[in-house]
Amino acid sequence: MAMAWLMGLGLALASVLWVELVRDCYHALAHVWSPLYRLHGWHHRVFRSDLSVVSTEIYQKAHWYNDVPEALVMLAFGIWPPLLTWMWQGFSQWPLILAASAGMVYTLGFLLSAIARGVGLPNADEITDLTHRPGPFLTPPAPWMVNRTYHWRHHFDDPNAYFCGTLTLVDKMLGTALSLKGKKIAVTGASGGFGQALLQELHQQGAKAIAITSCGQEVTVIGAEKTIPIRTEQWCIGQEDQLKDLLAEIDVLVINHGVNVHQRRDGQAIQEAYEVNTFSALRLMELFLATVKTNRHIATKEIWVNTSEAEVNPAFSPLYELSKRALGDVVTLKRLDSPCVIRKLILGPFKSKLNPVGIMSAAWVARQVVKGVKRDSRNIIVTINPITFIAFPVKEFFVSLYFRCFTKKS
């Protein structure tokens, strides 16, 4: 009996997931196939940037031209789970067939709510159109479930990304869960191996890359036919306030700078390791988070922090490990109340000035980081060590839980 219940529950959840995948694929297809976009385009005409409605007439038409056809497509494809269950088990297992029909029942809810909004039923939009409600955003874009902040970006950040309606799985698979096109992204430690490689990759993705470096040289990237100089800002540890104007201007801050004192353990080495690897990064984070003020900022501003694989594994440089672990824990703490997305880059040994004997190439690591970002991974692990893929998520979960239980918001 228990097995039958579990099988029924599994079929019901699978059928709901199936129609959600159908909806998101239909949406993505509408942005590349003009006959569908002629219908879907009405949806993009409805809202102002604060999600207020331009016109009640256009709002109602958009549901007849976009939402109702979308729900009908979901309903048509939703017949497959119960049909396949019938072919597999026969009609004698009708409870399983009913369970596999959950996706159709789920879709009927969307169809009826779309019709209600299309005919202008009072309060139908407030009850059923949750991702389009106006008002201030209370949370950053969610990683797995589509919230208002996440969906706002489809309308006003990049309409060729953020296609998902309820679950973000299709965007993660397509690499459209975060658009880098046109984003101003500043990278500290830009003169290092990974910093230069990441700037190159971001430039190729259509981002406006900005180098923040303590070196006096202008940073360049390789274009289609020539070397292109990019905007380079000079900065020294302890002078983070000088970057205030830049931090207010950019969309993404990548905290990538660091120092490795190797086997040293004297007082000066301790101070240098923590000042560069931990405290300067924290000051930059605080300055950047203070610039997150509007709905657009909450939706599009981000911090990426290179905390290193040293968070959970030995790096054979104790002070490097200690300072990076401290940074990692501070980032975990800041995430609890952050007004914008904060990502961790957990990178294994790659060739750089800090690690001349690294195994991976900085260019390859940068490509994997960008792929992870576009899949909206909040913890991007790039390493050759399989232990990290297990140890880091476990550590991050329990440390975050501990901080949540024993700290409180100011």
UniProtKB/Swiss-Prot annotation:
MF GO annotations: racemase and epimerase activity, acting on carbohydrates and derivatives
Keywords: Carbohydrate metabolism, Glycerol metabolism, Isomerase, Lipid metabolism, Membrane, Photosynthesis, Signal, Transmembrane, Transmembrane helix
SUPFAM superfamilies, alphabetized: NAD(P)-binding Rossmann-fold domains
Catalytic residues, chain numbering: 320 (proton acceptor)
Membrane-spanning segments: 71-91, 96-116, 380-400
Subcellular compartments: Membrane
Single Gene Ontology BP annotation: glycerol metabolic process
Membrane-protein topology: Multi-pass membrane protein
First-listed, main subcellular location of the protein, grouped into a coarse class: membrane
EC number, UniProt record: 5.1.3.34
Knockout consequences: The mutant lacks both monogalactosyldiacylglycerol (MGDG) and digalactosyldiacylglycerol (DGDG), and accumulates GlcDG. It possesses intact thylakoid membranes and shows normal maximal photosynthetic activity, albeit with reduced utilization of light energy.
Enzyme category, top tier: isomerase
Cellular component, GO annotation: membrane
Catalytic activities: a 1,2-diacyl-3-O-(beta-D-glucopyranosyl)-sn-glycerol = a 1,2-diacyl-3-O-(beta-D-galactosyl)-sn-glycerol
Signal peptide residue numbers: 1-14
PANTHER family tied to this protein: REDUCTASE, PUTATIVE (AFU_ORTHOLOGUE AFUA_3G10540)-RELATED
Function field: Involved in the biosynthesis of galactolipids found in the photosynthetic membranes. Catalyzes the isomerization of monoglucosyldiacylglycerol (GlcDG) to yield monogalactosyldiacylglycerol (MGDG).
Record NCBIfam families: PRK07424.1
UniProt family annotation: Belongs to the short-chain dehydrogenases/reductases (SDR) family.
Record-given protein name: Monoglucosyldiacylglycerol epimerase
GN (gene name): MgdE
